[in-house]
Amino acid sequence: MQLPLLFYTSVLAPAIGLAAPVAQNEALSKRENLCSLPAPPALCTPDPSVTVEETAKRAYAFYRSFVVDGDPRTMFSLIDSTYTQHHPGYASGPQNIWPLFCNGNKLGNEASTAWCFVAATNMSYARYSTTDRWRWVDGCVHEHWDQGERIPSEGCYKLPANRSQ
């Protein structure tokens, strides 16, 4: 009687342990390297019903994914298919910047960077080693500038305290 019990505990216990769910490290999953993909896995679909508050939340999520988390999947899910690039030397369209950001490298942390969304202009800003500006249309990043930009000192949208995305 004890021999089968010994068998079950020595053979089945490790197998059951392997079947248990493993907690994922969120920081590692955000820094996913997607460069094996020829294009972003998903882009933003413009939706004219997206509110100012939702756009501000999306702008914060974009800043986090681009600068702080190194999360190309989320970053590109907030860029529309007609993305216009105003940086000399770079073509417009998300597929043209995909190779620059697919690797999941982060650019800074929240303590050393800043972000702002100005509802009056539908523009968001991120400051890290440079300052970028994006125009949002129907809840999606539509245009980008990064030369001579400054983050506004006032007029930045205040997100609710929980900053849910």
Indicate residue ranges for each PLM-predicted region:
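Bacterial N-terminal signal peptides
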Residues: T9-P14
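C-terminal and inter-domain tail/linker signature
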Residues: Q2-P4, A15-Q165
